[in-house]
């Protein structure tokens, strides 16, 4: 199974570090299960073992828990646009729909909505309304009722709860 994982890898004023626990732990889990068949087209550099100590020191929490957990990467990140058009991937996952919507129109035009997933791990209960209206599966971490969003009720059939994860290699089994 081929999975295209779309997420940002650039710092901004709004997001000054790369670490995003929901996004990162989901990608770590997918990579653990499916290896190189998961292509993070915008490579999440801080998750890979070659991320430098100097860079690590700039991450939220100094990279504790999620950084440098992927030891190898044989993912083919070339010709992503062409691969989307040719439906090369079985699924397309947006790891943080608020932070990165790269290739979104192309994905929506070429993939069945059942093959697209949006993940919203932000610390608020608000939705990206435009994305919610796309009618794809929308995983939401902070999922609780808000009367200010009652106008979105018809779209809630696509919304599912999601929780944080934890990297398997950080769990002490003994």
Regions found by a protein language model. Give the residues of each.
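N-terminal pre-catalytic "stem/leader" segment of glycosyltransferase-like enzymes
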Residues: 1-128
